[in-house]
């Protein structure tokens, strides 16, 4: 029939930070093939699926992925060869069975995910479909509102800003292409403003600027200045989204949040909640990701009770794209949104299950890149297939980020009049003003 898996190849390639990562090719009997490369994160959740690294310090500083490659060639490939590529669930379940650990530490989530994504791409190609059409069927027509990273701090930079990502969301755009234009205009305007203030305009891992600003507040203020100067209204045309990555600031021993890159101030959970409540009043913020640490479930509950009806509260390190943690969050009434990172969980099937659970509970879902990316654009197709309406894939610079935006522009063009861009209405988990 031609749609059975004939061969699986795997290789070590380089990601956007110069570290090795896994790429896999799934080749079908008729010669059709799908190729996928996996990303990796800088700030990682303690409960994330395990990214298998070789640990040999004399090669790639211990970050080689040859063990994961060997696992694909020697363990995964012999079991999957001969299976139908059109049965994604069976393929993914077989790999989970072969691994047999909760965090995929035996075979490596990087090995499993590369094969999972490559299989879907091969199946789509075999059927003459785009990956978004194959994975999303008739529902795949919603283009996402992008979260564009424009200022980096914390673990993603070398400056005195505590919070990892300051992003803009073009919520007032009518189409995805217009959203990208608006974001790009603000990005270039911000560059001019930073340069005029004597700040460096070099970019961080995800393509945002990493200037040595004087405070966390200054980051919000220069972004608002850039939005206005570019001709847009903050909060109406373009809103701010944050990823403070507070797990990086949290000391589990003292249960305090330490603003270690700026004032060295120590805040209790209650004080951190008040901090965010003030910021939401002061700035046009629509979304905060990881506003509290992944171990601080009580703090998360307080934050959700305080501002969860005003803005989107996204669990990333908290949920690690895992249905068991998401279930706990839903039961406790913690957060109202989940960040979806395919490599945090390791298969497309589990990713779909997490999004399904979130939607049923009234939580939003955001498909996300990682700080170590490649030219692979699978997540662009995935966000349209899942219909989550939001994507987080970096700034308006660096090809590893732009590749995803360009793929979405192509998808929007291909969908023609059926393409929808929902802008602000994607935030169904909060009260709309």
UniProtKB/Swiss-Prot annotation:
Signal peptide: none annotated. SMART domains: Enolase_C, Enolase_N. Disulfide bonds: none annotated. CDD domains: enolase. Its main location: cytoplasm. Its EC number is 4.2.1.11. The keyword GTP-binding does not apply. (2R)-2-phosphoglycerate binds at residues 164, 341, 370-371, 392. It catalyses: (2R)-2-phosphoglycerate = phosphoenolpyruvate + H2O. GO terms for cellular component: cell surface; extracellular region; phosphopyruvate hydratase complex. The keyword Metal-binding applies. SUPFAM superfamilies: Enolase C-terminal domain-like (SSF51604), Enolase N-terminal domain-like (SSF54826). Mg(2+) binds at residues 243, 289, 316. Keywords: Cytoplasm, Glycolysis, Lyase, Magnesium, Metal-binding, Secreted. The active site is at 206 (proton donor), 341 (proton acceptor). One of its GO terms (biological process) is glycolytic process. It is found in: Cytoplasm; Secreted; Cell surface. Gene3D superfamilies: Enolase-like C-terminal domain, Enolase-like, N-terminal domain. Its cofactor is Mg(2+). It is an enzyme of class 4 (lyase). Binds a second Mg(2+) ion via substrate during catalysis. NCBIfam families: eno. Belongs to the enolase family. Catalyzes the reversible conversion of 2-phosphoglycerate (2-PG) into phosphoenolpyruvate (PEP). It is essential for the degradation of carbohydrates via glycolysis. This is Enolase. It comes from Borreliella burgdorferi (strain ZS7) (Borrelia burgdorferi). The gene is eno.
